[in-house]
A protein has these predicted regions:
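N-terminal leader segment of winged-helix/HTH proteins
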Residues: 1-35, 130, 141
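C-terminal regulatory/oligomerization modules of transcriptional regulators
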Residues: 1-5, 102, 124-147
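N-terminal helix-turn-helix DNA-binding core of bacterial DNA-binding proteins
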Residues: 15, 22, 26-67
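Alpha-helical linker/hinge and terminal dimerization helices associated
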Residues: 20, 24-27, 64, 107-125, ...
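Conserved amphipathic alpha-helical interaction elements at protein-protein interfaces in regulatory
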Residues: 34, 50, 77, 85, ...
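Residues within helix-turn-helix
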Residues: 57-58, 69, 76, 96
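Charged, amphipathic alpha-helical coiled-coil/dimerization segments
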Residues: 76-134
C-alpha cells in the first residue's frame, strides 16, 4: 500500500491513457494485417497521405513526433515494401524527401475502412470519439506549450 494515497495506480490519469494507447495499438493489428503494416507504419502512411507535398524526413518526424533514430528504420522498411522512396533534395543534400510510390498511394484506398473499424472497436459513437480526440488534442497542446 502506498504511503501517500495520491500514489495509487488507479488514481493516476496517466495510467488509463497508457493502457488505452496500448489496447488501441493492439486493436489496429488485425485491421492492418492484410496490408502487412504495423501500427507505426500505418501512422507514417497516414502522415504521407495527408501531406500536400512530399515532406522531408525532418518534417515527417515533427508531424509524427518521432526522432530520426525511430523514424529512419520505419521509412527503410516502408521503402523496402515498395510504398515510398527517400531521395536527397537536389537543392540541399542534407535534406531527404519522402515520396509515396504508386503502391503507397494505392494502399490508401485499401485501408479506407480502418478508421471506422477502429471507432467501432472502441465501443463509443462517433460524437464521443470526436470529443475524446478534441480533449486529447487540447491536452497535447497544453503540455507542448508548457514543455
Amino acid at each position: 500500500m502506498p504511503r501517500h494515497p495520491q500514489h495509487e495506480l488507479d488514481l493516476q490519469l496517466c495510467f488509463p491513457l497508457y493502457a488505452a494507447s496500448r489496447a488501441l495499438t493492439r486493436a489496429y493489428g488485425p485491421l492492418l494485417a492484410e496490408a502487412g503494416l504495423t501500427y507505426p507504419q500505418y501512422l507514417t502512411m497516414l502522415a504521407l497521405w495527408s501531406s500536400d507535398a512530399p515532406p522531408t524526413v525532418g518534417q515527417l518526424g515533427a508531424k509524427l513526433r518521432l526522432d530520426s533514430g525511430t523514424l529512419t528504420p520505419l521509412l527503410k522498411r516502408l521503402e523496402a515494401m515498395g510504398l515510398l522512396t527517400r531521395l536527397r533534395d537536389a537543392t540541399d543534400e542534407r535534406r531527404v524527401v519522402v515520396t509515396l510510390t504508386e503502391a503507397g498511394d494505392a494502399l490508401q484506398d485499401d485501408l479506407a475502412d480502418v478508421p471506422a473499424g477502429v471507432v467501432e472497436l472502441l465501443g463509443v459513437d462517433l460524437a464521443q470519439a470526436q470529443a475524446l480526440r478534441g480533449l486529447l488534442d487540447d491536452i497535447i497542446e497544453h503540455l507542448d506549450a508548457n514543455a
